[in-house]
From Swiss-Prot:
Gene: glpE
Signal peptide: none
InterPro entries for this protein: GlpE_sulfurtransferase (IPR050229), Rhodanese-like_dom (IPR001763), Rhodanese-like_dom_sf (IPR036873), Thiosulf_sulfurTrfase (IPR023695)
Broad EC category: transferase
Keyword flag Cytoplasm: yes
Residues forming the catalytic site: 63
Protein role: Transferase that catalyzes the transfer of sulfur from thiosulfate to thiophilic acceptors such as cyanide or dithiols. May function in a CysM-independent thiosulfate assimilation pathway by catalyzing the conversion of thiosulfate to sulfite, which can then be used for L-cysteine biosynthesis.
PROSITE patterns: RHODANESE_3 (PS50206)
Single biological process term from Gene Ontology: glycerol metabolic process
Protein name per UniProt: Thiosulfate sulfurtransferase GlpE
Cellular component, GO, one term: cytoplasm
Length: 105
């Protein structure tokens, strides 16, 4: 089972536990702006993700508004990952919280 956490809790996990934040939004939106340090998780990048993240590493899933990330978080749990989180409010919530982002502009 995955846990839902606030954007602030996600940022804290990234700092304190070196959690990996994966962004599942489309390529164009991810390239335009994303949470600082986010990994763009797609069907094509899943193999790279598996190499980078161990099953017990903390992984945080982010999408647009916090809905789609739940499905991906559940999928990762089914694949054997133990420490999975979904951001409440997604990237929109991350931005509203004023947390660090990286942009293409």
């Amino acid at each position: 089972m995955f846990k839902e956490i606030t954007p602030q809790q996600a940022w804290q996990l990234m700092i304190e536990e070196n959690a990996t934040l994966v962004d599942i939004r489309d390529e164009q939106r991810f390239t335009y702006s994303h949470a600082k340090g986010a990994f763009h998780l797609t069907g094509q990048s899943y193999g790279k993700f598996q190499i980078q993240c161990d099953f017990d590493d903390p992984v945080i899933v982010s999408c647009y508004h916090g809905i789609s990330s739940r499905n991906v978080a559940a999928f990762l749990v089914e694949q054997g990952y133990d420490n999975i989180y979904s951001i409440i409010g997604g990237f929109e919530g991350w931005q509203r919280a004023g947390l660090p982002i990286e942009t293409a502009y």
